Structure formats: structure tokens, C-alpha cells
From Swiss-Prot:
Protein residues bound to ATP: G86, K87, G88, G89, V90, G91, K92, S93
Protein's name according to its UniProt entry: Cytosolic Fe-S cluster assembly factor NBP35
Chain positions recorded as [4Fe-4S] cluster 2 binding sites: C259, C262
Binding site residues for [4Fe-4S] cluster 1: C33, C47, C50, C56
Iron-sulfur as UniProt keyword: yes
Gene, per the UniProt record: NBP35
Amino acid sequence: MAPSLETPESIDDVFANPIKQKPQLVAPEPQNCVGPDSQQAGKADSCAGCPNQAICASAPKGPDPDIPVISARLENVKHKILVLSGKGGVGKSTFTSLLAHAFATNPDSNVGIMDTDICGPSIPKMMGVEGETVHVSGTGWSPIWVMDNLAVMSIQFLLPNRDDAVIWRGPKKNGLIKQFLKDVEWGDLDFLLVDTPPGTSDEHLSVNSFLKGSGIDGAVMVTTPQEVSLLDVRKEIDFCRKAGIKILGLAENMSGFVCPKCSNESQIFKASTGGGRALAEEMDIPFLGSVPLDPRIRMACDYGESYFDSFPDSPACLAFQGVVKNLAMQLGLDSQDVLPDE
């Protein structure tokens, strides 16, 4: 018989309380125990003399008191967008950086990126602010400003050395994500983009739980044409549906290559099962568009420059503009207001 994974008692409780765990007791619960999750745990008369008293008294109980604080901090953020993909290496962080630069081309729009890829933060490098450090004031942490209307917050800014590994378990990751939402002075933003790691792990559960009170507009899925990528994106779509996160659409990255010499398009990563468009139709979600491969995107990210400013007429830039306009429609916005024509 094949092994099976243990199913949680309530999936809804997993989404609602991603970091609330039953304390690890050192002895069985006595007959008159009020319960380790009770508000009186460790304090009731029946707790006297119990080996678990100190453990139960220090365990978190009830609703997270920081949720209202987060909602108040983000009350002036108009749109909160998650960028997700079940698969690593599909260009999700690259997509986030391109999307931020696209939104920021409108000088009237203020944009923020929150990098929740705790163990592999690459957004600072792509935005050209890798060597910056966070300033802490009496009112909170100041994000790093890439330009007048584009800010970034990442764990990379908190590391003593650029190459330091972040070897953290879930609770520490969750705590930092909460700080990014609760303590960072995001100010008035039109768009807050949340770059996430691959999969459906602690980071995703925490972001969803912490932002429930202030509202998430939805998630953008990023994939490449291969079925290996699509398999994991299906799981990510299922995660969003179970978590109650609206799926704003799916974008296919690295979709073909347009030769700069002859303009002929080649399918380097040819779709074997229909690619992103077919998956969007299968899962009944909007298809935002396809962005072709362009080595200059990699170059712009390596040098921390805006691909939109450097290569505005390239096939990939024009395709990405279409993705942005389709996303604007899903947000209920006028595409001309989000990405004005020159």
C-alpha cells in the first residue's frame, strides 16, 4: 500500500492560522486541563503543578493582534497583487520586476515590491539596489527607493554580507513577512507587488493570512510552455482557490524567441500540451499573454536597469505591455491610466 500524507483536520484552519501551532507538551494533558489553546492555559487553578504549565502559558492564543495593525498600515495601498508560480526558474521574480517597472512608467503611479522569497532574494539585484541597507526610524522601516515612485523591501537589505545564506524555519520566515507588512512605511501606493518563492509553503500561507484583513486583489500566475511547469502551476491554482485568492490571470514567460536579425520566431521551449493558453482555458482563468525570450531581459536584470527604458520597441517589451494592459482590465482599471501611450 502506498504511503499517504496526513490530512489536516481543517484546511480552512490551515489558511486562517498558518503559524498557530499546538504547543509541544512534555507530559500528557491532565484530566482537569483547560486545554493548551484556552485563554486560561497555564493560568487556571488546575494548571498548578502541571509540567506543561510554562509551555501552555507562553503559547500564542486567539486571533493575531497584529492583523488590525497590518490593515491600518496598508490602508493607503490601493492594489495588492501576488506573483505566484508552483515551479522555480520560470522567471517569476523577473516578471515581478518587469511588472513593477511597467507600472512605474506612469509617473502618477506609486509602486512597491515586497520580496517574500526569504531564502533566495533576487529582487534587489534586478532592481539595482543590492547594496542598500534599511533605515529604521521611530515610525518604522523605510523601504529602498529605486526611483521616485518605485520602492522595494527584501531580506537582502538586512543581511550583513551579500552571500550569506538564510537558513530559517517557518516561524522566523513568518515573523519577517509580518514585519514587512506591519513595520515598513509603504505610504500611499497604487500597486504593491508581492514576489513569492516557488510552491505553496509557509511564505504563501503567511502572506494570505496577514493580508486577509486589508484585502488581496488577486494573484498572477507565471509559467513557461513546458508541461513540467504547467503541472506545478495547476497545484498553485488549486492553492489559490482553496485559500480564496482571486486568480487575475496566467502569463506565459519564455514563449518563443524572436530573432533580432530576421524577426523569425522559434519555439525554443515548445509546448507539448498547449502551453499556458491551453492551461488557462482548461482551468477557466484569464490568459494575460505570452512574453518571448530576450537575452536583453537577463542583461537588464543583471545590471539592475529597466528593460522598458532600455528596449522599449523590442518584441518582448511590446508583448509585456499587452500583458500589463490585460492585467489592468482584470483589476477593473483603464489600461491607458495604468500604462499610458507615449
